[in-house]
């Protein structure tokens, strides 16, 4: 037998830094509202200088849980925080916000969430327990400048953090997270690690944040984005998202609940589907961001969208595998939606993007890779290396003749613009594009060119190999200057 002696001082520290919610009146039967008791435990813990609030095994029906600085909310294995239904009136009301014209209610309000914190330091949510959104709404009916309806007055996020510093979320699972399973806005020093999220709308949104790491996580979102860096106007100012690392993650678009139960039922491809996307909200922009060692399954592809006047600079994407991809495998665009005050918007900047070591199998025939600016404003300094894509194919001659519309001020979603006239790569309004060791294959014959480039200055293609139908052009160049093709099988009849 091994005996452990704990000093009186250590015993005092242990007894005063751990707070079990059961000791504050939490029942954990899934019927009684327990958030009042949990909030009492959090308040007492904070009054003692901080520590760990323990939620032991049980089902805890809750409205809004309010985090405080220096608190670790620990969900033990078997513990479930269950979101109350709207008619129970258990969620905090949304806070006042000076201007709702430039973002929807989901990005405007934080207090009407299942777990929320604002202006906090040193907070964490950890443990092997689960957050089950239950009664959270996933609707988004707020209109620009009119945030009534939809999620207002109900709970709409599982975890919402605003202007917090030194944040850790680790090991927990989230099911049915509402409009956002996790939304962090204006936060610094964020770690999200080993999370499992199975929800209907957005999984993880990192908005106007700095120094964030998302790692070793599985995020399933059949009807919205899985991991979505943004830089909205939710702080009533422009703020860039920068120094971001997303690594060792699996994103997917299976039906909600089928990631957790193991059945992995494919969801019908829709508006957006289980992807990693930068944007659409992009007032501040994105700088010094890395996505590495990630897997996309039954989802849309990677999207980099800069459309609200900010800057996108120094982005590296590497070591990515995609299978059963809808709509497109890679989408890089500069647009002019300019959702924000007129004195803060204008044409944005997209430059210095490196994408390498990408493998895509069974990509949709709607569109290949798209890299587009707008007339007079160019996407600049883009490198694609070691990219291998198997497309479904099946495009016809009419598709190949189609005049592809400019994005202009429209919402940047490729399927809204229709079938692309190139099956592999469409480039327009770009300066300095390098393609090295690129392979495009089609599972069925495709009568569209593999590559179309328009209004490009500085284009280098080296070791580019593509499938092409007999007698059809493999590439089309219009208004392309400083073109260099070598070691490639590209033909033009």
Could you describe each region identified by the protein language model?
Residues 2, 7-493:
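Extracellular/periplasmic carbohydrate-active domains that bind, remodel
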